[in-house]
Amino acid sequence: MLKQYLKEHYLANHKALYVTLDDFWFTNHHLIDVAEYHYLHGGTVLFVDEVHHYPFVTWSMELKNIYDRYPEMQVVFTGSSMLQIDNTLADLSRRCVFYDMYGMSFREYLEFYDIMNVPKISLEDLLQNHVKIGLDITSEVKILPKFQDYLHYGYYPFYKEVTDSYEKILQQIAANIIEVDIPAVEKIEYSTVVKLKRFFALISQMVPFSVNATELSKNIEVPRQSINKMLALLKKSALVNLLYNGKNTMGQLAKPEKVYLENPNLMYALTPRADIGNIRETFFANQLMRNHEVTFSGKGDFLVDSLYTFEVGGKNKKFDQIKDVSKSFLAVDDIDTGFGDKISLWMFGLLE
């Protein structure tokens, strides 16, 4: 992504420099020396990729020093989702703005592939006006085939470049996150990495599922108390989403009620016979968890912002399970537009 931006905006001059810190060259060279050389030779922009692979423990301090020494230089850096803004990054966080980079929402997918530009909508607007919004969109685009394409290959923007090997690449990315990214950030032993990989392979065939720590610990031969910690690592690395019963105030100690893979594309790549009902729930959780609190609901599938209850299903889904629940809605697949409190599932991919 950084290289693409550089090509589009800085190809004609030498004021911008791109480096990736997983390059072998950085095993005995420091980033701050590169920044100094670039600045002294007229550089004004420095793109730094993969900071979590920097072989020295000083990457955040070096970025801070670059900012302080060369205030005219703009620095853009990327790192694994494993990098949390904690006390070790406090000095750096006061000097820069951090962004979480998610995969594409369905709305972003429609725009990326030049299918249709749809404005962002709020959840409240969707709940109140979904019929009109849906009719406006479906009058211009046959939306259901596009939605099915999105569920299979629309989450990551590189599908166009790797069409025939997309699912294989997703498998490789998942393995690389566990084998390389997590150990680069977390202090874990190789034996733990092996068990974490086994754990992820196991749960990818089970999702979504309710957590039975005793059974899982037997299958991968780890202490029972390690299961929640392993799930938390997979969550931080954007491989799974965890659904808790109410607000999680216990961090890694809390037991999630349900585990999902992070997005439907991963499900199709890792679970060839993925159940469509599970795909639907995975999509809903993925799209809503970006900007909303999504927790386990005892009556429906999801409780959003401690206010709205949602049941997810196919076009024949009924209100039976949530008929007595206030502010409850059906998120239904295989319909262009909904009616009343029955909302087309694809529309939850339009949220801001």
Language model features with spans:
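Catalytic P-loop NTPase motifs of RecA-like helicase/translocase cores
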Residues: 25-27, 53-55, 84-85
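Short glycine-rich substrate-engagement loop in P-loop NTPases that contacts/grips substrate
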Residues: 13-45
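Conserved Walker B catalytic segment
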Residues: 52-76
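Conserved P-loop NTPase "ATPase switch" module shared by AAA+ and STAND
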Residues: 39-59
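A cross-kingdom feature that marks ATP-driven nucleic-acid transaction machinery
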Residues: 1-11, 232, 237-352
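Interdomain hinge/linker elements that couple catalytic modules in large macromolecular machines
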Residues: 114-264
